[in-house]
């Protein structure tokens, strides 16, 4: 047993070293409460905040979405707390409201007021939490293949194990990263299906996301997600701001009928943007659709 743990620990150290060597931080850092967040801050004009999904990072928006938006807007793409190059929160229990609070503090520290907030996948959960908990701090909202409603999900054993005191630390620092690296290609293909994985896919968020501390943060996020959504979904009718809901009809990760279509029908005045034949990873495969949706939300928020 000790030999297996040592082998896993060495393998983990090699994967972490390679990921950090190949994918250093390319943005700046901002202090928000107890955390230091990594942010890609580009352009000028009406502000847009981009919130990435699970096992992702700010680089998921870069360069296509960020560059297109930065031509006319100030764009802030954060690594969420505990993800990418950002610090984890002291209390890592997966509550999206805590991430929402820290992101608001971060953009305020950068002099931004009432941005349009766009969230992809799990990032939409956080974006909705921002809009519900701090309505006056958001100009408009965009969800992109969002995790929005409870779907009756059951916890993954690996994520549960990562949360166990002491034993979870051993798991995340020995075998979690190697095992995640082996299943990552299958997960990536599913995220792009029914389309192929494009050559432009930036693998840096995945490589960084399976490092021990990042794996633990992702595990906490995903483990807490379905119970949290059972509470948050009761409040969606409270949303009283411009909302654009972007959905890929072929998404295998966040089922369109459960998540995006349901939200669009619940919120008066919501605009639904449907993308036939596309999969979950719209920021990569249909960046122009994502950019257009965000820009329309910005304009609606300024009226």
Where are these regions (language model features)?
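Alpha/beta-hydrolase fold catalytic core
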Residues: 1-47, 71-73, 112-113, 299-303
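Conserved alpha/beta-hydrolase catalytic His-Asp/Glu region
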Residues: 18, 153-158, 176-238
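Active-site loop/oxyanion-hole signature of alpha/beta-hydrolase fold enzymes
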Residues: 40-42, 77-118
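Conserved HGGG/HGGXW glycine-rich cap/lid loop of the alpha/beta-hydrolase fold
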Residues: 42-85
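Flexible "cap/lid" loop of the alpha/beta hydrolase fold
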Residues: 132, 142-173
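Acidic catalytic loop of the alpha/beta-hydrolase fold
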Residues: 224, 250-254
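Short beta-strand/loop motif that positions the catalytic acidic residue
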Residues: 239, 245-247
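Catalytic active-site module of serine/aspartate enzymes centered on a nucleophile-bearing elbow/loop
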Residues: 268-303
């Amino acid at each position: 047993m000790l030999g297996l743990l040592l082998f896993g620990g060495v393998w983990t150290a090699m994967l972490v070293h390679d990921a950090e060597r190949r994918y250093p931080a390319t943005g700046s850092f901002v202090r928000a409460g107890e955390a230091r967040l990594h942010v890609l801050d580009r352009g000028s004009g009406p502000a847009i905040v981009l919130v990435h999904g699970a096992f992702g990072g700010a680089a998921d928006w870069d360069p296509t979405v960020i560059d297109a938006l930065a031509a006319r807007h100030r764009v802030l793409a954060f690594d969420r707390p505990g993800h990418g190059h950002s610090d984890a929160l002291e209390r890592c229990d997966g509550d999206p409201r805590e991430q929402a609070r820290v992101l608001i503090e971060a953009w305020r520290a950068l002099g931004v007021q009432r941005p349009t907030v766009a969230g992809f996948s799990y990032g939409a959960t956080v974006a909705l939490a921002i809009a519900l908990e701090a309505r006056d701090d958001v100009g408009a909202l965009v969800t992109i293949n969002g995790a929005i409603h409870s779907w009756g999900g059951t916890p993954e054993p690996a994520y549960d194990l990562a949360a166990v005191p002491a034993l979870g630390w051993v798991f995340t620092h020995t075998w979690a990263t190697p095992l995640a690296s082996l299943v990552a290609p299958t997960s990536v293909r599913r995220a792009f299906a029914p389309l192929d994985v494009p050559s432009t896919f930036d693998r840096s968020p995945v490589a960084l996301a399976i490092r021990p501390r990042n794996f633990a943060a992702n595990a906490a996020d995903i483990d807490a997600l379905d119970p949290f959504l059972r509470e948050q979904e009761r409040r969606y009718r409270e949303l009283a701001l411009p909302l654009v809901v972007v959905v890929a009809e072929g998404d295998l990760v966040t089922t369109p009928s459960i998540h995006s279509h349901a939200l669009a029908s619940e919120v008066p005045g919501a605009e639904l943007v449907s993308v036939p034949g596309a999969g979950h990873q719209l920021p990569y495969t249909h960046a122009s659709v994502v950019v257009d949706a965000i820009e329309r939300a910005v304009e609606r928020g300024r009226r």
